[in-house]
């Protein structure tokens, strides 16, 4: 084993943060140093040259001074007997670089902690430094040899029910955490007595997972008595009623991993499977929709819990039909009170929590990062979401109890696209190969299905922890690339059946696969790819290692499928074959036995149906009189409540421009304020049709009136999605995610009544279907605190997500008030019809109250009329701005519109109230509704349209936006409230800022927060030195000659399709080229005029961002010669964007004229930054930027490592004067800047892109390929038609070729 010291592992900011955390745990800690340590398992002595290559491979990341370590060593390594995702990627890179003597490379972090401390202190320090699920801590480098030792497999065990009877099974139930119910234990004893043998532990675990509440939805399928009355339908039956009443537009419901609805016809853009040339295929592009929850894991370990929640939902989409493509994501969090240190709010009363779960604040720091990191690395934009906190002590008939979200809601959802011919799964033929695609088995996430089905606190802490999985998004990206290559083959698609691997691991996925295909299966356990060979059969079969799919591939299609996997470097294995008889057999060649041999009907068959006999409880509530409150203090409290406050800290960490198909993200207008009501994507690059999604949830209302909370969730979804241009209301389809503390007094009846209100009444009245959903029935946390039994129970929680095809993505409305449209009016549409019900409002919550009467949807006809009028007015161009009314009420809606429009407000409430005591209720009630801005000369027409639709009593003109910073509200001519927009926006932004300060580099957070005080910030602007609507490539395109450009990707790259689309539009033939094609000699770069290295996370950024990719080219002789030859050709050009920019900067030794280039390292904020930034094009030789010098315009950025690091100040100066700086970040005034967030990565002198001395090779961190169409820009000038300014760059390349 070779031991190689690595670079320091912590930046100055992370170092001081960790040191502070350690000191809080152990006060004797006085110092800390951390560096990477690398360990290589070699089968022979390396030559001097090989050693040199290895040393260069392991030198990566920013230049931080190396120290001589002092203090006690805590060496954190991957758990022995496992192979970390880092190791498998780094070992792949080493092999690609010709280091064949290296069996495996592994990495740890050596923490040196100074101070005098006891063994107990040392244990506390070790606990803080590692994740015990995947890591261990040693005190000596030499002990790391255990990384490469091979454990012997553990044997199978049987449970003796023939001898020990029921007691033996009950004991196994507790020890294995199976969560079996009494009738399930009876069922298993009967079944195995019938088979005449004892069950194996693996069979019991498999049964427990497949039949857990998580997988079987027993409560939703149960029969019900309420108050002694038998109920006609099950919960699921009432949801299905929506489909039975209105099934039009739904292509698949209730039977697959996601639901499918009808989309639009467009030119679906992808590479031809045979020629690899990108092109558009005109066909129906249908929409798939799915929303999942991952609540239990997120409470225990928020980063991996939320990451694997997102990953699982993405796999659900990809595994729909015969393979589909995920497109855009959403995320949601509901937690208890945050209690931010130094920023605790008056309503946040500390109650405590059990040891086994983390705090609400920790969930909101780590969970969103986990979800965002997975989406970012996979390559899916995160475009909408919600965030709510709720924790309150309430009085019930049983005494006081705390209601809240110690067990959080973590929602991960999204939409994708699927081909018409692939919506339904195909037949699994007998003999079909049953394949696992993706990562290896590891002892991760055991028993997750059963664990998440229990109330938190009813299982052991170790079992809770064991049930959390860990993530490897780059592996999932490779799997998706395989699925994409398969569906792109059309009727030659080798996949006949596919499922994702989720709860229960293979023990649930393979039986489900063969059972759904009306087959049985014969499997060999040792064929399962396994990075932890010491596992017992139960652990191999039931672990929940992520990033895996199971597929059935016909024998005739197998070779085609195998070739695709090899090109994409995606691991797969044939684990079994499909049989005609419905028997499940798993053999084990190592031990020569059969751990599983049972009829599928025992596993998945007639387990007893649950019956629920429950009673309704009296509704609860308290007196709340808003008229007695000070309005100014109310405003401050409401603006700081997390459900109302800015969600910026949740948004800028997530890529929102990847795919180049995003038409509306959360950030609105020239000042990029996070207030959008819905998310919108384009169907493809050649059309203006698309898809919209929006969310609705009003969970605290359920404490007062559960059915009202369900109706309001649907209502809010509709008032949100109404901002997009949708043909008709019935085009909208809903996902319903139900969370309940089943068994808690009154909650089961509340659940039943709410499902009935939604499924049997409101949705049928609206003509809307719920074709997909999910339930989580154990939303309660129990613990003992110094002998006192405590619990926190969630309110019944329905989270609704709406999805719909969009007829024109250019007509999406936003809350940005327009000050360039003459005199305008603000009109309130109040669907509460003046009732102003204040129950469970944010205002009530910020005073520790609930109130008594909840807002509600009183009449479905009003909602239908509202939607139709808004769509008509939008179609006719009458609405300038739109925002729904929700949390915080009318005051918050109008303020958010003013924040987005950077203007003041003059509101008068005369038409809404009879006397001054009603004003608080008018300003803060959360009845359904919206505020629209219209030109004053159109106001009579707009009011008339609402009147004609029967909404005359719902509409009122409430004021005007004004062109200054003042917000004033009056009643009968008397001032009610006044304030400065800037200061109100700071209050609204402060909660987000406080969390950002704790999580990221505090200096950057301070700069961004202080920028809100700037009075004359003009926002994003465009100043062009060319005509955006001129196509300079047109004459060359007319010749019919289309030069070839190689669209280059490596495993983990995810930005290739939009890059190809931009070059294709500019008149090139874009060809899909994988690095594996170059290494294998399948592709010759001499065939290409141009090459572009695309964005993403090559090798998951292992060995540095873009560095592993670059080194696999530098140290592989075939690849090195190919690249060097290409760069030296005077007729070739090259572009590198984001990850491609990082990669090319590491190839500078092969690129003539690139000696001034920097190395790109971690952003100064220490965070992934996804924003719209202003850049200025510099005078340079870049062939891409000719005729653009001096132009200033916005561009999409999305990266974690974009900071340009030069060797020293002299090197920076040389670069500056060499004329090779191509782009610089500027602030909104057009000045070159290093300040955050205008310069999102802190690069010196604003450097954002470089070129070579002759201009043939250009690299940049921003993403022009994501904003080449006008509609792809989050904000754009109105005179941009189809093309955006960045299209010029690609056309310049086409003109240069001629």
Swiss-Prot record:
It comes from Pseudomonas syringae pv. tomato (strain ATCC BAA-871 / DC3000). One of its GO terms (biological process) is 'de novo' IMP biosynthetic process. SMART domains: GATase_5. It is found in: Cytoplasm. This is Phosphoribosylformylglycinamidine synthase. The active site is at residues 1138, 1263, 1265. Keywords: ATP-binding, Cytoplasm, Glutamine amidotransferase, Ligase, Magnesium, Metal-binding, Nucleotide-binding, Purine biosynthesis. Phosphoribosylformylglycinamidine synthase involved in the purines biosynthetic pathway. Catalyzes the ATP-dependent conversion of formylglycinamide ribonucleotide (FGAR) and glutamine to yield formylglycinamidine ribonucleotide (FGAM) and glutamate. Its EC number is 6.3.5.3. Monomer. One of its GO terms (molecular function) is metal ion binding. It catalyses: N(2)-formyl-N(1)-(5-phospho-beta-D-ribosyl)glycinamide + L-glutamine + ATP + H2O = 2-formamido-N(1)-(5-O-phospho-beta-D-ribosyl)acetamidine + L-glutamate + ADP + phosphate + H(+). It comes from the Bacteria. The gene is purL. Pathway: Purine metabolism; IMP biosynthesis via de novo pathway; 5-amino-1-(5-phospho-D-ribosyl)imidazole from N(2)-formyl-N(1)-(5-phospho-D-ribosyl)glycinamide: step 1/2. ATP binds at residues 305-316, 384-386, 676, 886. In the N-terminal section; belongs to the FGAMS family. Residues 1045-1298 form the Glutamine amidotransferase type-1 domain. Mg(2+) binds at residues 677, 716, 720, 884.
């Amino acid at each position: 084993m070779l031991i190689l010291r690595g670079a320091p592992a912590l930046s100055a900011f992370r170092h001081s943060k960790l040191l502070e955390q350690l000191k809080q745990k152990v006060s004797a800690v006085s110092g800390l140093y951390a560096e990477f340590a690398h360990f290589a398992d070699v089968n022979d002595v390396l030559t001097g040259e090989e050693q040199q290559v290895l040393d260069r491979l392991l030198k990566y990341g920013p230049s931080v001074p190396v120290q001589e370590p002092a203090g006690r060593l805590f060496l954190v390594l991957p758990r022995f007997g496992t192979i970390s995702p880092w190791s498998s990627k780094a070992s792949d890179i080493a092999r690609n670089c010709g280091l064949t003597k290296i069996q495996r490379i592994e990495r740890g972090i050596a923490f040196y902690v100074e101070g005098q401390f006891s063994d107990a202190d040392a244990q506390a320090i070790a606990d803080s430094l590692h994740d015990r699920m995947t890591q261990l801590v040693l005190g000596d480098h030499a002990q790391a040899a255990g990384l490469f030792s091979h454990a012997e497999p553990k044997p199978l065990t049987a449970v003796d029910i023939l001898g020990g009877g029921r007691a033996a099974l009950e004991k196994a139930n507790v020890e294995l955490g199976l969560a079996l119910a009494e009738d399930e234990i009876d069922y298993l004893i009967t079944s195995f007595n019938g088979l005449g043998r004892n069950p194996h532990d693996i069979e019991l675990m498999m049964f427990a997972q497949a039949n857990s509440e998580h997988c079987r939805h027993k409560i939703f399928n149960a029969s019900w008595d309420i108050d002694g009355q038998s109920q006609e339908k099950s919960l699921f039956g009432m949801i299905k009623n929506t489909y039975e009443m209105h099934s039009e537009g739904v292509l698949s419901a209730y039977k697959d991993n996601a639901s499918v609805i009808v989309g639009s016809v467009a030119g679906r853009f992808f590479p031809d499977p045979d020629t690899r040339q990108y092109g558009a295929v005109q066909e129906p592009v249908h929409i798939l929709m799915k929303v999942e929850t991952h609540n239990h894991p997120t409470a225990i370990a928020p980063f991996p819990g939320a990451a694997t929640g997102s990953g699982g939902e993405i796999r659900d989409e990809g595994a729909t039909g015969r393979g589909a493509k995920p497109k855009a994501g959403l995320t949601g969090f509901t937690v208890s009170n945050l209690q931010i240190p130094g920023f605790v709010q008056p309503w946040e009363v500390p109650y405590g929590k059990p040891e086994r779960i983390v705090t609400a604040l920790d969930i909101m720091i780590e969970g969103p990062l986990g979800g965002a990191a997975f989406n970012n690395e996979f390559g899916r934009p995160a475009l909408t979401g919600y965030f709510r906190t709720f924790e309150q002590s309430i009085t019930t008939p049983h005494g006081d109890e705390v209601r809240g979200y110690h067990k959080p809601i973590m929602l991960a959802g999204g939409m994708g696209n699927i081909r018409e011919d692939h919506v339904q799964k195909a037949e699994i033929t007998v003999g079909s190969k049953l394949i696992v695609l993706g990562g290896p088995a590891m002892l991760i996430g055991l028993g997750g299905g059963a664990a998440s089905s229990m109330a938190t606190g009813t299982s052991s802490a170790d079992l809770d922890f064991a049930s959390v999985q860990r993530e490897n998004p780059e592996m999932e990206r490779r799997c998706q690339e395989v699925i994409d290559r398969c569906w792109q083959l059309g009727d030659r698609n080798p996949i006949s059946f596919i499922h994702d691997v989720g709860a229960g691991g293979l023990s649930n996925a393979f039986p489900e696969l063969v059972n759904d295909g009306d087959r049985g299966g014969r499997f060999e356990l040792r064929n399962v790819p396994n990075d932890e060979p010491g596992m017992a059969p139960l652990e191999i079969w039931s672990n929940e290692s992520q990033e895996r799919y199971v597929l059935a591939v016909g024998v005739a299609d197998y070779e085609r499928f195998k070739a695709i996997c090899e090109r994409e470097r995606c691991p797969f294995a044939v684990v079994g074959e499909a049989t005609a008889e419905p028997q499940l057999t798993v053999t084990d060649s190592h031990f020569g036995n059969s751990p599983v041999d049972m009829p599928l009907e025992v596993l998945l068959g007639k387990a007893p149906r649950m019956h629920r006999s429950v009673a309704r409880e009296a509704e609860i509530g308290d007196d709340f009189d808003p008229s007695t409150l000070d309005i100014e203090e109310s405003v401050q409290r409401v603006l700081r409540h997390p459900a109302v406050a800015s969600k910026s800290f949740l948004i800028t960490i997530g890529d929102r421009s990847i795919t180049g198909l995003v038409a509306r993200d959360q950030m609105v207008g020239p000042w990029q304020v996070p207030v959008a009501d819905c998310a919108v994507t384009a169907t493809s690059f050649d059309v203006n049709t698309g898809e919209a999604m929006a969310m609705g949830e009003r969970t605290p209302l359920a404490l007062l009136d559960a059915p009202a909370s369900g109706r309001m969730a649907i209502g809010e979804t509709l008032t949100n999605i109404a901002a997009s241009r949708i043909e008709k209301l019935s085009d909208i389809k809903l996902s319903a995610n139900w969370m309940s503390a089943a068994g808690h007094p009154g909650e089961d009846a509340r659940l039943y009544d709410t499902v009935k209100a939604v499924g049997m009444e409101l949705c049928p009245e609206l003509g809307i279907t719920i074709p997909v959903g999910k339930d989580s029935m154990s939303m309660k946390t129990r613990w003992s605190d110094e002998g006192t039994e405590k619990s926190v129970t969630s309110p019944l929680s329905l989270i609704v997500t709406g999805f719909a095809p969009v007829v024109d993505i250019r007509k999406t409305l936003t809350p940005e008030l327009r000050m360039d449209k003459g005199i305008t009016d603000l009109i309130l549409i109040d669907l509460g019809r003046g009732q102003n019900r204040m129950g469970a409002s944010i205002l009530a919550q910020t005073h520790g109250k609930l109130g008594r009467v909840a807002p509600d949807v009183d009449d479905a006809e009003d909602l239908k009329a509202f939607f139709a009028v808004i769509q008509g007015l939008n179609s006719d161009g009458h609405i300038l701005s739109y925002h729904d009314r929700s949390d915080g009420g009318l005051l918050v809606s109008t303020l958010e519109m003013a924040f987005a429009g950077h203007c003041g407000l003059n509101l008068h409430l005369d038409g809404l109230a009879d006397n001054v005591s009603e004003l608080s209720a008018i300003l803060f009630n959360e009845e359904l509704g919206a505020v629209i801005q219209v030109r004053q000369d159109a106001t009579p027409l707009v009011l008339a349209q609402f009147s004609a639709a029967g909404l005359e009593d719902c509409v009122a003109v409430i004021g005007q936006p004004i062109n200054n910073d003042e917000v004033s509200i009056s009643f009968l001519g008397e001032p009610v409230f006044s304030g400065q927009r800037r200061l109100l926006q700071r209050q609204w932004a402060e909660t987000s800022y406080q969390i950002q300060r704790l999580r990221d580099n505090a200096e950057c957070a301070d700069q961004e927060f202080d920028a809100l005080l700037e009075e004359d910030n003009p926002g994003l602007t465009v100043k062009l030195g060319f005509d955006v609507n001129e196509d300079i490539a047109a004459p060359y395109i007319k010749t019919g000659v289309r030069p070839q450009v190689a669209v280059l990707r490596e495993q983990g790259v995810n930005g290739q399709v939009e890059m190809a689309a931009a070059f294709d539009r500019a008149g090139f033939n874009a060809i899909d080229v994988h690095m594996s094609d170059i290494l294998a000699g399948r592709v010759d770069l001499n065939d290409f005029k141009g090459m572009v290295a695309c964005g993403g996370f090559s090798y998951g950024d292992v060995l540095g961002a873009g560095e592993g990719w670059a080194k696999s080219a530098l140290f592989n002789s075939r690849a090195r010669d190919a690249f060097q030859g290409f760069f030296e050709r005077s007729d070739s050009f090259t572009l590198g964007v984001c990850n491609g920019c990082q990669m090319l900067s590491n190839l500078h030794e092969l690129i003539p004229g690139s000696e001034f280039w920097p190395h790109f390292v971690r952003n100064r904020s220490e965070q992934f930054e996804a924003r719209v930034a202003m850049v200025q094009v510099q005078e340079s030789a870049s062939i891409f930027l000719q005729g653009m010098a001096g132009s200033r315009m916005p561009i999409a950025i999305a990266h974690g490592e974009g900071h340009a690091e030069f060797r020293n100040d002299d090197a920076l100066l040389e670069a500056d004067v060499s004329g090779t700086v191509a782009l610089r970040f500027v602030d909104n005034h057009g000045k070159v800047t290093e300040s955050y967030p205008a310069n999102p990565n802190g690069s010196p002198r604003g450097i954002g892109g470089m070129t070579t001395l002759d201009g043939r090779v250009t690299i940049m961190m921003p993403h022009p390929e994501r904003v080449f169409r006008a509609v792809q820009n989050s904000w754009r000038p109105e005179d941009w038609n189809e093309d955006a300014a960045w299209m010029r760059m690609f056309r310049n390349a086409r003109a240069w070729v001629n």
